[in-house]
From Swiss-Prot:
Subunit-level organization: Part of the 30S ribosomal subunit.
Keyword Protein biosynthesis: no
Organism: Saccharolobus solfataricus (strain ATCC 35092 / DSM 1617 / JCM 11322 / P2) (Sulfolobus solfataricus)
UniProt binding sites for Zn(2+): C21, C24, C40, C43
Keyword vocabulary terms for this entry: Metal-binding, Ribonucleoprotein, Ribosomal protein, Zinc, Zinc-finger
Pfam families: Ribosomal_S27e
Sequence similarity: Belongs to the eukaryotic ribosomal protein eS27 family.
Gene: rps27e
Gene3D superfamilies recorded: Zn-binding ribosomal proteins
Cofactor(s) it depends on: Zn(2+)
The record's free-text note on cofactor binding: Binds 1 zinc ion per subunit.
PANTHER family: 40S RIBOSOMAL PROTEIN S27
One GO-annotated biological process of the protein: translation
GO cellular component: cytosolic small ribosomal subunit
Protein name: Small ribosomal subunit protein eS27
């Protein structure tokens, strides 16, 4: 008899991140695979640049959520 192999459940590679703005220190939640540039809500500095797939994060990642 063949044993049944354990079926792994796929998990997404994308996450939500808590990012700190390098200019004003404001913390904001962003998506790791953002397709649109994200600006800081306080000072307007771009925190994330779209790079086609995974976004390039300019600010400091404080926490990975989820």
């Amino acid at each position: 008899m063949m044993r049944k192999l354990r079926v792994l459940i796929p998990e997404p590679k994308s996450r939500f991140l808590r990012v700190k703005c390098p200019n004003c220190g404001n913390e904001q939640t962003i998506f790791s695979h953002a397709t649109f540039p994200v600006r800081c809500l306080s000072c307007g500095t771009e925190l994330v640049y779209s790079m086609g797939g995974k976004a390039k994060i300019v600010g400091e990642v404080v926490r990975i959520m989820g």
